[in-house]
Design a protein with these regions (language model features):
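Bacterial N-terminal signal peptides that target proteins for export
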Residues: 5-24
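Bacterial N-terminal signal peptides
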Residues: 22-33
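N-terminal, polar/Ser/Thr-rich
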Residues: 36-82
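Ligand-binding face of N-terminal immunoglobulin V-set domains in extracellular IgSF glycoproteins
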Residues: 84-101, 105
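Extended, low-hydrophobicity, Ser/Thr/Pro/Gly-biased non-transmembrane segments
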Residues: 86, 149-244
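A surface-exposed beta-strand-loop module
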Residues: 104-166, 224-225
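Juxtacatalytic substrate-recognition/specificity segment
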Residues: 248-364
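Acidic/His/Gly-enriched intrinsically disordered linker/tail segments
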Residues: 365, 369-417
């Protein structure tokens, strides 16, 4: 503690007369340093998000992955993950090969074995887009079973993304290397990357693979957990789990599996979520065609914690939790009521997510948001009539003189006609 007129050394000497003060200060400094070094949320990825060192790695000639599997056990109380991964590799080169895998920087790798024999491995200091590179040398044998164990906290280079790496009894999301180490330089076999994923979670949680596959319960345990299993065919993968409510809806020639958090159930029912999904799917499929990312039969609509707007893939699409708050559903700029705001957000499955059309130029009168507003207007006009649609979707954008407002709300970049 600095003392007036005594300088740093004099102040230290006077403060040291009470020993607990400098000891407490030193302890606090040590705790600050330890907290910074052990920060579980932030990795040290290359800040250049366009870097593609890992993505552009040359594949190994003569090495292929025939099958892989993972057994994952998140600890929802501590917010950590433990798992075992196995890779069935075919090495036709007759030589030892170095296999590279992407691992989340927060995991510790251990017990790496090839055909049951422990082998050396190394993890790179360089990190890129939430991954470090794990390198292992597999033997010259033609058939190699590579197994390893991993565990820790999956770090994130975007720590401000709420829910991005949440691991709790209500919600979790494990993406790619956070789910299991991802093969970087091994090509798929003739059948692709067939994979079996098992995950053990509290019984109240529902497991939702972000793909066309469905997870099923294969075991129930005495400690109040269940083991889920699903099959997929890709090098990585994304898995959501949480306390979800599932509604099955027939619309647009598809079976829609609509998943949303149980805490939003009252809001969803009051907003007529199921009816909104049905109206949007029927209208948009009839006027614009099928979704670009459906599998032709089923589509999962999954409400995430927060994903900055959502995204879509093979047979699944993500909806942002923020879209379904009472505040957003009451936004008059997106509709005349909660049900219409719900329609607006669902229309983004067609206009948005980077699937249905190229990004518009800065001078284009249309955008994903503009097309969504216009489509919402057309759906509401069909459901409730032209007068209602004009009142809530045209007149509100006009001033008292009947002309368009100079600065309409940013939610809509077009004027319905």
């Amino acid at each position: 503690i600095r003392r007036y007129g005594r300088g740093p050394l004099g102040s230290l000497a006077r403060t040291a007369r009470r020993v607990y003060r400098p000891l407490l200060a030193a302890a606090l400094l040590l705790c600050c340093g330890w907290s910074c070094a052990a920060q579980p949320f932030i990795d040290h990825s290359n800040p250049d998000l366009s870097a593609m060192t890992f993505l552009t790695m040359e594949p190994l000639e003569g090495v292929a992955c025939l099958r892989r599997s993972a057994q994952v056990t998140p600890d929802t109380r501590r917010g950590t993950v433990a798992g075992t991964a196995s890779y069935q590799l075919q090495n036709t080169t007759g030589q030892e090969q170095t296999v590279a895998l992407g691992v989340t920087p927060g995991y510790t790798i251990s017990n790496v074995r090839a055909n049951g024999v422990e082998i050396p491995f190394s993890v790179s200091d360089y990190q890129e887009y939430n991954e470090a590179k794990l390198e292992v040398a597999i033997p010259a044998e033609e058939q190699v079973e590579l197994t390893l164990e991993y565990g820790g906290f999956p770090q994130e280079d975007l720590p401000t993304m709420q829910g991005g790496k949440e691991l709790s009894g209500e919600y979790l999301c494990l993406e790619n290397a956070a789910l299991s180490p991802r093969l970087m330089n091994v090509m798929p076999g003739e059948d692709g990357y067939p994979a079996t994923i098992e995950i053990t979670l509290p019984a109240a949680m529902t497991v939702i693979p972000f793909c066309a596959s469905e997870a099923e319960v294969v075991a129930e345990h005495g400690d109040g957990t269940k083991t889920w299993r699903y099959e997929t065919n890709r090098a990585g993968g994304i898995l959501y789990a949480g306390d979800y409510v599932r509604e099955e809806i027939q619309a647009g020639g598809l079976t829609i599996d609509f998943y949303y958090g149980r805490k939003h159930q009252a809001v969803m029912e009051a907003a007529g979520a199921a009816e909104a999904v049905r109206a949007v799917m029927d209208y948009c499929a009839g006027h614009y065609g099928s979704l670009a990312f459906g599998d032709g039969e089923r589509l999962k609509l999954i409400q995430s914690r927060v994903a900055g707007g959502g995204y879509a893939g093979d047979g699944a699409s993500l909806l942002d939790e923020a879209d379904f708050t009472a505040h957003n559903l009451g936004d008059a700029g997106k509709g005349g009521g909660a049900a219409e705001v719900m329609i607006h957000e669902l229309v983004h499955q067609w206009w948005g997510l980077g699937n249905m059309f190229d990004t518009s130029g800065p001078d284009s009168p249309w955008s994903a948001e503009g097309l969504t507003c216009y489509t919402t207007y057309r759906i509401v006009k069909e459901l409730y009539g032209g007068d209602y649609a004009r009142e809530h979707y045209v007149d509100q954008w006009r001033g008292e003189d009947g002309k368009p407002k100079e600065e309409p709300p940013a939610v809509c970049s077009c004027t319905a006609k």
